[in-house]
Every structure is written in C-alpha cells, then in structure tokens.
C-alpha cells in the first residue's frame, strides 16, 4: 500500500510588539506611502528581548499539535527551518524538542533562508512516504529583527519575526501531492547574511542582511513562474485546479506576479505581507495557519505553496488539505 503524508494540524505565533511604517519613517528616510507602494507592507511584528526562535516555535508547535490531537511524545521527527537560530549548535530543533519535553525522536534544522519551510516540508514528506516516520512536526521560525540594519531603509522595512508550524501524519491518500526544491549558489552575493565567526566576515557592518533588491526581484519573478509550471505539469493539473495560492510573503508585487501566472484572482491568494512583513521561513506556515483557522482554506481543497530566498533556493509544494 502506498504511503502519503497529510497536514493534520497547524499553528502560528506573532510577537506582540508591532512596528509600523510611520515608526520607521521616524528613523530612516522613508514613508508609509513609499513602503506600501513598493512592498505592500504596512507593519511587522518584532520579538521581545526575551523571545527567541525556539520560544516562538514552541508556541506555534503546541497549537499545531493540539489541532492535530497529537501528543508531543508521539512525534517521530522534528524538522525546523530557520536562518536565525538560538545558537550555532545545538540545533534550534533540539532546543524545541527540550521545550516540548520530548526525548524519543530525532530533531534537526534546515537552512534554506526564505524557502526553508518548503525544504523542511519536502524532507518530512519523504520520511513519511518511505515509511520511516508516521508523525512529523515541521516548523519555520525567525527572529529576523536581530539581523537587520535598522538604519538601512532598503532592508529594515521588509522583515518581521514569527513562527509557524504544521504536523504531518501518514495517510493512505495523498495530502502532499508533490514537492519541488531547487538551489543555485551562483547568486549567493545578491542576498545574504554574513557569519561574524567566519574568516573574513567578522566586522560589525557585516552582521546584518545584505540584499540587492532589484536583482533579487527579477530572478524571483521569473523563477517562481517556472516552478508553477513544473508543479502543475508533474501532477497533470491545470491552473484552474488550484483553489488557493499560499506564497512566501516577501513582496506584494512578487506575489501578484505569481498569481497572474496562475490566472488566480487575488481573492484566492493568502496575503499576510501587509500585516507581518517578510518572516522568512515562517511566512508560509503562518499564512497557511491563518487561512485554515479563519475558514478560507477548507478540507479537500488544492493548495499551492511556493517560496524563493537566499542561495538562491526556491521550492513549491502542492497539497490537498
């Protein structure tokens, strides 16, 4: 009998502190109108001093586990995507495991920048399909605010903090229909966060996110268009078969371009970038959780998730919820 994975539960967490565009305009030369026109972002959530990637992940994970009616001790695997880990090592997944009081399963991190959740979901799906796991917790969690240069208007306007999670469980019919992941390291210098501990990258200036925005935008739009075609073709589906697009929340113009490629009206696209900014690997599970909980996404509907980020790394997941 074939084995598949399905999403059994979702969860999400956003910090209480909110920074608006007007707040940023008091610090750098910008305005609410300028930011909204170029990005679609109006506000973003910022982690408190005592919040970390693992603490936010715990809240989102407990919500997802409760929604799935699964005890943490019944998990076979924890996969956590982040570019802002609590520590270089051990993995933030291990720290989350400790917070959940679990000892019996493996736990590890995935680092694929803004595409991290898709990469983690793909790995989890493979574990379940191969019969090596029955229940997997997949998390995206980020504290981007601690890697942002708050005096650089090109990046400080973009990023927010938060965590999202899903529980995957084995099923006899496809939930996850396919996943597709790709990377091309030749673009590494267009979007990156240096490691201060690495040789030659230890200056104070290099401890913040660096991005060549216009170049990233061009590649992202073209690349996401191609992965939409790849995903539909592999599954023998037409654009009209997709009920919902849940994209990485980087920029409303990129999101709109992908929706246009799918011939989807924006009413069938889950958009959170206006209220949350770019939460990197957390953005897709946060958006998915919101749309599930408010009733927009219903059981049996077909959902396309897609993401693009530093590396470059990009990917998609097609699923029947």
Swiss-Prot record:
It comes from the Bacteria. One of its GO terms (biological process) is fatty acid biosynthetic process. It is an enzyme of class 2 (transferase). InterPro entries: ACP_syn_III_C, ACP_syn_III_N, FabH, Thiolase-like. Keywords: Acyltransferase, Cytoplasm, Fatty acid biosynthesis, Fatty acid metabolism, Lipid biosynthesis, Lipid metabolism, Multifunctional enzyme, Transferase. Pathway: Lipid metabolism; fatty acid biosynthesis. Residues 249-253 are annotated as: ACP-binding. It is found in: Cytoplasm. The active site is at residues 114, 248, 278. Its main location: cytoplasm. Its EC number is 2.3.1.180. One of its GO terms (molecular function) is 3-oxoacyl-[acyl-carrier-protein] synthase activity. It holds the Pfam family ACP_syn_III_C. GO terms for cellular component: cytoplasm. It catalyses: malonyl-[ACP] + acetyl-CoA + H(+) = 3-oxobutanoyl-[ACP] + CO2 + CoA. Homodimer. NCBIfam families: fabH, PRK09352.1. Catalyzes the condensation reaction of fatty acid synthesis by the addition to an acyl acceptor of two carbons from malonyl-ACP. Catalyzes the first condensation reaction which initiates fatty acid synthesis and may therefore play a role in governing the total rate of fatty acid production. Possesses both acetoacetyl-ACP synthase and acetyl transacylase activities. Its substrate specificity determines the biosynthesis of branched-chain and/or straight-chain of fatty acids. The last Arg residue of the ACP-binding site is essential for the weak association between ACP/AcpP and FabH. Belongs to the thiolase-like superfamily. FabH family. This is Beta-ketoacyl-[acyl-carrier-protein] synthase III. It comes from Methylococcus capsulatus (strain ATCC 33009 / NCIMB 11132 / Bath).
């Amino acid at each position: 009998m074939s084995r598949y994975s399905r999403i059994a539960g979702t969860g999400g967490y956003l910090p209480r502190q909110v920074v608006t565009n007007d707040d940023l305009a008091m610090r750098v030369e910008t305005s609410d109108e300028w930011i909204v026109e170029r990005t679609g972002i109006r506000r973003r959530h910022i982690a408190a001093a005592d919040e970390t990637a693992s603490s936010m992940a715990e809240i989102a994970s407990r919500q997802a586990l409760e929604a799935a009616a699964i005890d943490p001790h019944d998990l076979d695997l924890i996969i956590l995507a982040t570019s802002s880990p609590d520590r270089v090592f051990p993995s933030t997944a291990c720290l989350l495991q400790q917070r959940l009081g679990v000892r019996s399963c493996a736990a590890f991190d995935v680092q694929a920048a803004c595409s991290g959740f898709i990469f983690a979901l793909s790995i989890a799906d493979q574990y379940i399909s191969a019969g090596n796991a029955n229940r997997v917790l997949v998390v995206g969690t980020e504290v981007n605010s601690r890697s942002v240069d708050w005096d650089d208007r090109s990046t400080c306007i973009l990023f927010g903090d938060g965590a999202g999670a899903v529980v995957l469980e084995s099923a006899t019919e496809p939930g996850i229909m396919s996943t597709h992941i790709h990377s091309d390291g030749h673009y590494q210098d267009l979007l990156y966060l240096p490691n201060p501990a690495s040789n030659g990258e230890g200056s104070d200036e290099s401890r913040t996110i660096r991005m060549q925005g216009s170049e990233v935008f061009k590649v992202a739009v073209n690349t996401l268009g191609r992965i939409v075609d790849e995903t539909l073709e592999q599954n023998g589906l037409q654009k009209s078969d997709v009920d919902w697009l849940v994209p990485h929340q980087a920029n409303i113009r990129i999101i709109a371009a992908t929706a246009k490629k799918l011939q989807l009206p924006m009413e069938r696209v889950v958009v959170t970038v206006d209220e949350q900014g770019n939460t990197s690997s957390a953005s897709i599970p946060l958006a998915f959780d919101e749309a599930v909980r408010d009733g927009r996404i219903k059981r049996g509907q077909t959902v396309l998730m897609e993401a693009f980020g530093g590396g470059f790394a990009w990917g998609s997941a097609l699923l029947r919820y």
